[in-house]
Amino acid sequence: MHNIPPEESLIEYPSDFPIKVMGKQHPEFAQTLTEVVLQFDPGFDPASVEMRPSKGGNYLGLTFTVRATSREQLDSLYRALHGHPMVSIVL
């Protein structure tokens, strides 16, 4: 990761920040990843997760809108989601 000075960041903190996650359809996909998100944003509301199944129903897309408080928080959350075995893509 590159160190970007706060004055050069395109994100102002704190702010609401959407993170999109895709993975294969699994009964516990949304719940499992919500638990990961809660580790980085304890105030996250699980009822706010947006879910979109793929056209064929094999994949599920989730959008988590987290309260971003720092670049470090977002970077750590992205790493945790990207490294999770149920996750295919994080945007």
Curated annotation (Swiss-Prot):
Q: Which SUPFAM superfamilies match?
A: YbeD/HP0495-like
Sorted alphabetically, which InterPro entries does this protein's record hold? Answer: UPF0250_YbeD-like, YbeD-like_sf
Q: Which Pfam families does the protein's record reference? A: DUF493
In terms of NCBIfam families, this protein maps to: PRK02047.1
Into which family does the record put it?
A: Belongs to the UPF0250 family.
HAMAP family the UniProt entry points to: UPF0250 (MF_00659)
Protein's UniProt name:
UPF0250 protein BP0104
